[in-house]
Regions:
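Adenosyl-5′-phosphate
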Residues: 1-7, 21-22, 117, 170-171, ...
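Short, flexible loop segments at the rims of nucleotide/cofactor-binding pockets, characterized by
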Residues: 338-343
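Active-site adenylate/phosphate-handling loop in enzymes that bind or generate adenylated species
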Residues: 351-411, 487, 496-516
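Short low-complexity, flexible loop/linker segments enriched in glycine and/or proline
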Residues: 331-335, 357, 379-381, 565-567
Length: 628
């Protein structure tokens, strides 16, 4: 696991080595073990590529950049390739010679043999850049799910790319203007999905794509990574259950290859419990499992992780944390995202990563289980949308919404359940794009139009995704496809990457496996959600290893009481961000409208937890990063 950087600039326009080292320094936390640089002159440009390394595989010989045998090609790489041994053996049989045991060298050798068509053969999480001197081009690629980040920007004098925004921006003469589409997306979704960033002219490379940069003319094109889809044959649910079992076991096995200590995050939920079980079954010695508990019983679920640990006989590490532990790290965590990000579960993810780092360098997680196997309530609720809209006329529906809205508005909602009920009812749509509404956890378009100034609001901010993924969402497969592009890539994986990398620990997600994704896409919806039983086929595959009904117990997740914090220890900071003079100078918000929304929450007139937290996170970024 590492961080990578690179740029193409006009010759003699910058001190390339100093700039590259600055970029590496800004992402030192991603790879504190070593660093490397490559600089060359090509045509009218200077080309630079750098990286910082967190050593996991081939610790002694895996430093980068890595060169081809004839020095004509060079690579810097962030991530892990889980099938690299299989690919390496195939290449050796074709006559390739390897100098290291690293997966980085395998990527480069495979590229030498097959070009960018080889990228689809990689099973793993990655962002890398390959410079090919024979054709004067750089290829910059990102993995299938988007586990590893990659930002890029074309400027008047060249092209820049980096693992984190802070590194890329250090190469620009000034910070770009705020992108209004990204601004609206953030306040709707509470995160900014690829390809957008908060800055004009800077983009995220979307998952499963690569950039082809022509260094002769400073021109680039973006292509989807071609890959063959795995086909599966099954005649019954029992067959599908066996395939599920084997695919999950194999994925855990491939993701447990490491030359450094490894363990699992064990929350006690279905996904992390199954990953931990598989790893325990595959290892000869006790595995290390890690969980956090809360000193407040309302938020604590550590009994579930203890139960699983006892079942699989793991060496369990449990860290009890308080609200003070969470709030003490807010600045460090939120500002590390480099752009507005309002998923409050990042606070707990950071803490479990930080505490786990004292014991292991790699942790397997249950991330992706809900998206791959159909684990969200919103999936079967989505199926009810068509039934509901066919039975309930719009006029009656909106009367129901108004009544429930008034009923729930003044209630406290620390876990967001009442908010979700209100959001669910308001998102029911008679025009078939229900699911895009239900995943919008922030403001509605009407609310955004009210609180944002005219020049800051962008209507139809989700249109890019509706055009790319599809407008109509009527099946679980549709919902999962939307989540893969938006919530998984833009929220979940960003959260895990930034919080774990901030503590210099590598997280691996066995459920984020292309074969598993292909397989579950070929299953009937009823195999994923059977009545009210979510992740049905996954539970069927592993139920024999757990006590009866254990896998059907609900889990609350990393909920934190941000609504209370905004009325207490965060209130002074929040009110500073609401200062009239500051808001007028900022020229983004309507002062009267945003003040009313915030003050209604602070005075407990209306529970606006999610909206006010989103506003708070944006203002924290604006004041401490954008204005800094």
């Amino acid at each position: 696991m590492c961080g990578i950087n690179g740029f193409l600039v006009k010759k003699n326009s910058v001190d390339s080595i100093s700039q590259l080292r600055l970029m590496n320094k800004l992402i030192f936390h991603r790879g504190p073990d070593s660093h490397g640089e490559f600089i060359d002159e090509i045509y009218d440009y200077s080309l630079a590529m750098g990286m910082t390394r967190l050593s996991i595989i081939d610790i002694d010989n895996g430093n980068q950049p890595i060169y081809s045998e004839d020095k004509s090609k060079v690579i810097v790489f962030n991530g892990e390739i889980y099938n690299y041994q299989i690919l390496k053996n195939q290449l050796i049989s074709d006559g390739c010679i390897f100098k290291t045991n690293s997966d980085t060298e395998v990527i480069l050798s495979l590229y030498e043999k097959e070009g960018p068509n080889s990228f689809g053969k990689l099973d793993g999480m990655f962002a890398f850049s390959i410079y090919d001197t024979t054709i004067g081009k750089v290829f910059i690629a990102r993995d299938f799910f988007g586990e590893k980040p990659l930002y890029y920007s074309q400027t008047a004098t060249g092209f820049i790319w980096a693992s984190e925004l802070k590194s890329l921006i250090s190469s620009l003469p000034s910070k770009p203007e705020i992108d209004t589409i990204a601004l609206s997306l953030f306040f709707k979704l509470t995160f900014i999905p690829a390809p957008f960033t908060i800055y004009q002219g800077i983009k995220k490379l979307e998952a499963n794509h690569y950039i082809e940069l022509d260094c002769k003319i400073n021109n680039f094109s973006i292509f989807e990574i071609y890959r063959s889809t795995s086909k599966f044959s099954f005649n019954s649910k029992n067959d599908a259950s066996k395939i599920t079992h084997d695919l999950v076991q194999n994925s855990v096995l491939s993701r447990s290859i490491s030359d450094v200590p490894l363990g699992t995050f064990l929350s006690g939920g279905v996904d992390s419990s199954i990953v931990s079980l598989c790893l325990a079954q595959q290892q000869d010695t006790k595995i290390d499992t890690f969980s956090i508990g809360f000193d407040k019983k309302a938020f604590d679920e550590s009994d579930k992780s203890r139960q699983v640990s006892k079942l699989i006989n793991s060496k369990h590490h449990e860290f009890i944390i308080s609200e003070k532990d969470l709030t003490a790290n807010i600045d460090e965590i939120l500002l590390n995202f480099d752009e507005p990000f309002a998923d409050s579960s990042a606070l707990a993810t950071y803490l479990v990563s930080k505490k786990t780092k004292d014991f292991v360098k790699v942790a397997l997680t249950g991330d992706g289980g809900d998206e791959v196997f159909g684990g969200y309530n919103k999936y079967y609720i989505g199926n009810l949308n068509k039934k509901y809209t066919s039975l309930v006329p719009p006029k009656i529906h909106f009367n129901i919404v108004g009544y429930i809205d008034n009923l729930l508005s003044i209630k406290d909602d620390s876990r967001g359940n009442r908010f979700k009920i209100k959001r669910l009812l308001k998102s029911i749509n008679y025009e078939d794009d229900f699911y895009y509404n239900i995943i919008s956890l922030g403001f509605t378009d009407d609310e955004l139009k009210s609180i944002l100034n005219v020049g800051s609001f962008s209507s139809n901010s989700l249109q890019y995704f509706k055009d790319k993924i599809g407008l109509y969402s009527s099946s679980i497969s549709d919902f999962r496809a939307i989540d893969k592009h938006l919530s998984l890539e833009g929220d979940m994986l960003v959260k895990v990457d930034r919080t774990s990398m901030l503590t210099s620990i590598e997280c691996r997600a066995p459920f984020l496996n292309k074969e598993l994704w292909d397989f579950t896409n070929q299953l009937p919806d009823t195999y994923l959600i059977n009545g009210w039983d979510k992740k049905h086929i996954l539970k069927e595959a592993f139920k024999e290893y757990f006590p009866k009904n254990f896998l059907n117990k609900s889990k609350k997740g990393f909920g934190v009481p941000v609504g209370d914090w905004l009325r207490s220890e965060l209130q002074l900071e929040l009110l500073f961000y609401l200062d009239k003079e500051f808001l007028i100078k900022q020229n983004i918000f309507d002062f009267e409208k945003i003040s009313k929304l915030v003050l209604n929450h602070l005075e407990s007139k209306v529970d606006n937890t999610f909206r006010v937290w989103t506003f708070y996170c944006f203002q924290k970024w604006y004041k401490n990063t954008y204005e800094a």
